[in-house]
Amino acid sequence: MTKKEENTDLKKKVENGKIVSPVLPKGVKNYLIDIDGTIGDDIPNEEPDRMVTAKHYPDALKTINNWYDEGHIICFFTSRVESHRKVTQDWLNKHGFKFHSLLMGKPRGGNYHWIDNHLVKATKYNGKFTDLIEKEVKIEVFDDTDN
């Protein structure tokens, strides 16, 4: 069940007198969620016939749909290739996942490090999909001290 992102939700942002990329309203999150091995069985691109019958994870379905209903943006970001878009959309819809968009072609192999000018948070899926909790962890950042 896809729903177009409404541009009216985005808030204009100005820095140093110039308009920059807009931001979501306070409290609204952009969830970027993997598919294979995260919300359902881990199926490689080399075996697309298995994508149709892959099992979904009920806890992921419940949590993601709750986030959607709370007004957060749900985007599935997968390493599946563009030719697998239809089977992927059909599978998401068949299992009742609510989402706004689907991005194909995420690099394969893991060990991701996302660099962005907006706040980025990452959560590694370890077999249990629940609401998120706060936890202090060690992270890698750019050295922004003046030399």
Where are the model-predicted features located?
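HAD-like aspartate-dependent phosphatase fold
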Residues: 1-147
